[in-house]
A protein has these predicted regions:
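Asp-based, Mg2+/Mn2+-dependent phosphohydrolase catalytic module
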Residues: 1-5, 102, 116, 120-217
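Metal-dependent phosphoesterase signature
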Residues: 57-96, 104-106
Length: 217
């Protein structure tokens, strides 16, 4: 990993803890429609990772037809947008580690399944504008992770090869994204998935605290 020039990060569950606001928006929506569900925080931790539309689908227990799901998803977006920063915060030690990487000349990228506008807004609010070299969220017409397209787009933007990058993520989706892109995968077990789920994906290494990030460079 000594030749690494780029660090790619998932957003939700890796850089930023967003679960309370994601769950909150879903709860508002399912209560509006009197949907009989009593989800726990642990449930929502398992629902996230494949984008907001999939989150809504899982919150309604995958009972919605495609037309209704699209309608609910369109309702979810402004609900979440209103509260997305109420509780969201960077995990302890993340900013310090990112500063170390920047000092080493490492390119920093965010590759997330969160809608692009929401992703850019959140990252800039928490870390500052232009802190990251590249932020790529979910964009219509571009497949979401674990498809590697967004990851390849990020690498192209910063002028790096897959062999020069490490992908940090907290879920099986991220580990598969890295594998599909031919990139070293590092599991972050402080996020939304368990160590066991990450381990089953055979990443290069699993770290349980952000303080270990810079030690991989």
């Amino acid at each position: 990993m000594s030749k690494t020039k780029c660090a790619l990060f998932d957003l939700d569950g890796t850089l930023v803890n967003t679960i309370d606001d994601l769950a909150g928006a879903c709860e508002i929506l399912i209560k509006k429609y009197n949907f009989d569900a009593h989800w726990t925080k642990e449930d929502y931790l398992n629902f996230v990772g494949n984008g907001a539309k999939k989150l809504v689908e899982r919150a309604f227990n995958e009972t919605l037809d495609e037309i209704t799901l699209n309608e609910r998803y369109e309702e979810f977006k402004p609900l979440y947008d209103k509260i997305k920063l109420d509780h969201a915060h960077a995990y302890d030690g993340i900013k310090e580690q990112l500063d170390v990487l920047k000092g080493m000349g490492i390119k920093l990228c965010v590759v997330t399944n969160k809608p692009n506008v929401a992703a850019v807004g959140m990252v800039e609010h928490i870390f500052g504008k232009n802190y990251f070299d590249c932020i790529i969220g979910c964009i219509d017409g571009i497949p979401t992770k674990p498809d590697p397209t967004s990851t390849f787009n990020a690498l192209k933007k910063v002028g790096c090869k897959p062999s020069e990058a490490i992908f940090f993520g907290d879920s099986e989706v991220d580990m598969r994204t890295a594998k599909n892109a031919g990139i070293e995968a590092v599991g972050c077990s402080w996020g939304f998935r368990s160590f066991e789920i990450l381990f089953a994906e055979h990443p290069s290494v699993i770290i349980d605290e952000p303080k270990y990030i810079s030690k991989l460079f």
